[in-house]
From Swiss-Prot:
Biased composition (Basic and acidic residues): 385-405
Disulfide bonds, paired cysteine numbers: none
Region (Disordered), start-end ranges: 1-68, 109-244, 272-484
Transmembrane segments: none
Name of the featured protein: Uncharacterized protein CXorf49
InterPro entries assigned to the protein according to its UniProt record, in alphabetical order: DUF4641
Biased composition (Basic residues): 368-384
Gene it is expressed from: CXorf49
Length: 514
C-alpha cells in the first residue's frame, strides 16, 4: 500500500518507562523514522544494536529478553517467527497489512501497572475491525513499525483486537505453543493525560465499516499454536474479518462473567433474610400441622415449633410465635399440659369438639365397628340370623324336638311345609337341586320338605346328611295328611307342569333330529 495507508495503535495510558505516557503510533511502509513515541520497548536510542540486558541480531536490531521485560513491567510485542536473528523475506511494498496479520499470532505481556491505567475516553476507532498493529525495531535502535510489508508476514508483532467496552481484565489462556496467550482489557471510561487518540486511516471501506461501531477497546493477544501461512490477500482478508469478529464474541461476554460473579459474592448477604424466613417457616408448618392434623402431633407440636425458632429472633417474635403456638398446642393437647413457656390461664376447649388422637376410637364413631358385616366367611347376614332364630324358637316350642337330631329338621311339623310352599323351593330326586326347578318325575312332591332342610341349614355345614334320612318320615306322613288343601293343589299343578315339560323336551328332540 502507499503511504496514506497507516496503522495506529491506541497506546495511550500505558506507563512503559517511569511514568512516560504513550501516545499514538503511526507507521507507513516508507517511513523508517516515523513517530516512535508509542509503545516503548525499553531499547536505548543508539544505533549500535545492543541493549543492556538483551541480545543483538546480525542486522543490528536490539531486543531485550522477554523474561526481563515481563519483570520490569514493559510491553513486549513479539511475533513468534520474527524473533531476533530470524531472516525474513521481503515480499513487496503494495500489500495490505491486515492481510498478513489476519492469521498472525501476537502477544502482549501486560505489566501489573497497565491493568489499572485508563483508556482515553474520547478515543474512537475510525479504522475497520481488521486493523492490525506491528512493532519492529529499526536500524537506529528506535522501535518503529516495519519498513516493508514483506516483513509483516513472519515478523509481525501484534494483532489489534477491537472489542466492546468492559472492565479492566487480564487473563491467561494456555495455548499449544511454548508460551501462553495474554489478553489485556483497558477501561475507556477514565481520560488519560494525552487526550483522545485516533486510528487514522484513509481507506473508505474500512471507514464505512467502522462508522457504525461505538467506542471500542484494543486488545492485543498472541496465539502460539498457529503459524502464519502465505496466501492470497482475499483469503487473508476473510480470515481477518472472521478473527476480529471471533475476538469480539470472545471478549464481549467477559463483563457478563464479572457481573454474574459479583452477585455470587453478595448471595450470603442477600440470602440472610431468606434464611430467616426459612427459619420461620418451620414454625408456620408446625402450626398448620397442629391445626390440621391434631392426631399426628398430640402433645409436642407446640414445644417442637417453639424449639425450631432461631436464636437470633427478637423476644417480640418469640412472644408472637408462642401465642400462636399456644393456641395450636391447646388444640392438639385438649386436657394435656400446654406448650413450653405457656400459662394455664387459657381454658382448653372441649375435647369432644375436636378430632380425636390417632389410635384412640372416638365416642361419636361407635358405628364404625359395624362396617365389616360380611368380612368373615363364618358369619351370616342379619336376615338369615332372624330366620334361624325364628326356626329355633319353633323348635323349642315343638314337643317332638328330641326325636330327631337337631341338625335335621323334622318334616312332620306343620310350619315347615308352608314355608317351603311359599318360597317355592321344590327339589327333584337329586338332592343338589334346590332351586325352584321343575322335576322330571312326580315324586318331588314327597321330597319338597326334604329340600328345605339343607337349604336352611346350609351355613352350619350339615348340607348333605339331612337329605337322606327323611325318606322313612315321608312314608309316615304323606303330603296332604296335615289338612293343607293348598299343598295338594300345588302338587297337582306340579304334575301338570312336569307333563308339559316332558312334551316340550320331546318336541325339542324332534327339531334337533330334523
Amino acid at each position: 500500500m502507499s503511504s496514506p495507508d497507516k496503522v495506529s495503535v491506541c497506546g495511550a495510558g500505558f506507563d512503559l518507562e517511569g511514568g512516560k505516557k504513550a501516545g499514538s503510533r503511526t507507521a507507513s511502509p516508507g517511513a523508517p523514522g516515523a513517530h516512535s513515541h508509542g509503545l516503548d520497548l525499553g531499547v536505548p536510542g543508539s544505533g549500535d544494536g545492543k541493549s543492556e540486558s538483551g541480545f543483538t541480531d546480525p542486522e543490528g536490531f536490539s531486543f531485550e529478553s522477554e523474561s526481563e521485560l515481563i519483570e520490569q513491567g514493559r510491553v513486549v510485542l513479539w511475533g513468534r517467527e520474527g524473533r531476533p536473528g530470524t531472516p525474513v523475506d521481503d515480499q513487496g511494498d503494495v500489500v495490505d497489512y491486515s492481510f498478513y496479520l489476519a492469521d498472525e499470532p501476537a502477544a502482549i505481556v501486560p505489566p501489573p501497572s497497565v491493568q489499572g491505567h485508563p483508556f482515553p475516553e474520547g478515543a474512537a476507532a475510525e479504522g475497520s475491525a481488521e486493523n492490525w498493529a506491528d512493532a519492529e525495531v529499526g536500524p537506529s535502535g528506535r522501535d518503529v513499525l516495519g519498513h516493508s510489508p514483506g516483513k509483516w508476514q513472519q515478523a509481525s508483532a501484534g494483532r489489534l483486537h477491537l472489542c466492546g467496552p468492559g472492565p479492566v481484565r487480564a487473563w491467561k489462556n494456555p495455548e499449544r505453543g511454548s508460551k501462553s496467550r495474554w489478553s489485556l482489557r483497558v477501561d475507556p471510561q477514565q481520560p488519560s493525560a494525552k487526550g483522545p487518540t485516533r486510528l487514522p486511516t484513509h481507506d473508505s471501506d474500512s471507514a464505512d465499516e467502522s462508522s457504525d461501531l461505538p467506542l471500542m477497546k484494543v486488545g492485543i493477544c498472541r496465539n502460539e499454536g498457529s503459524q502464519a501461512k502465505p496466501g492470497s490477500p482475499k483469503k487473508r482478508a476473510d480470515t481477518s474479518r472472521q478473527a476480529s469478529f471471533h475476538c469480539k464474541e470472545s471478549y464481549l461476554p467477559v463483563p457478563g462473567r464479572f457481573l454474574t460473579s459479583a452477585p455470587r459474592g453478595l448471595t450470603p448477604v442477600a440470602e440472610r433474610p431468606a434464611v430467616g424466613e426459612l427459619e420461620d417457616s418451620p414454625q408456620k408448618k408446625m402450626q398448620s400441622r397442629a391445626w390440621g392434623k391434631v392426631e399426628v402431633r398430640p402433645s409436642c407440636s407446640g414445644a417442637a415449633a417453639a424449639g425450631a425458632l432461631p436464636q437470633g429472633l427478637s423476644r417480640r417474635k418469640m412472644a408472637g410465635g408462642k401465642k400462636s403456638l399456644g393456641g395450636a398446642s391447646q388444640l392438639a393437647l385438649g386436657r394435656g399440659f400446654p406448650a413450653c413457656g405457656e400459662r394455664l390461664s387459657a381454658a382448653p376447649p372441649e375435647p369432644a369438639t375436636f378430632p380425636p388422637f390417632s389410635g384412640v376410637r372416638p365416642q361419636g364413631m361407635s358405628k364404625k365397628p359395624q362396617k365389616p358385616k360380611h368380612s368373615s366367611p363364618g358369619k351370616k347376614p342379619a336376615g338369615r340370623k332372624t330366620r334361624e332364630s325364628q326356626a329355633a324358637a319353633r323348635e323349642d316350642n315343638d314337643p317332638n324336638r328330641d326325636e330327631v337330631p337337631r341338625a335335621q329338621l323334622p318334616t312332620h311339623r306343620p310350619g315347615l311345609p308352608r314355608l317351603s310352599v311359599r318360597r317355592g323351593e321344590f327339589s327333584s330326586s337329586d338332592p343338589n337341586i334346590r332351586a325352584p326347578q321343575l322335576p322330571g318325575t312326580s315324586e318331588p312332591s314327597a321330597y319338597s320338605p326334604g329340600g328345605l332342610v339343607p337349604r336352611r341349614h346350609a351355613p352350619s355345614g350339615n348340607q348333605q346328611p339331612p337329605v337322606h334320612p327323611p325318606r322313612p318320615e315321608r312314608q309316615q306322613q304323606p303330603p296332604g295328611a296335615q289338612g293343607c288343601p293348598r299343598c295338594i293343589w300345588l302338587q297337582r299343578e306340579i304334575e301338570d307342569l312336569t307333563q308339559q315339560l316332558a312334551a316340550m323336551q320331546f318336541l325339542t328332540d324332534k327339531f334337533q333330529d330334523l
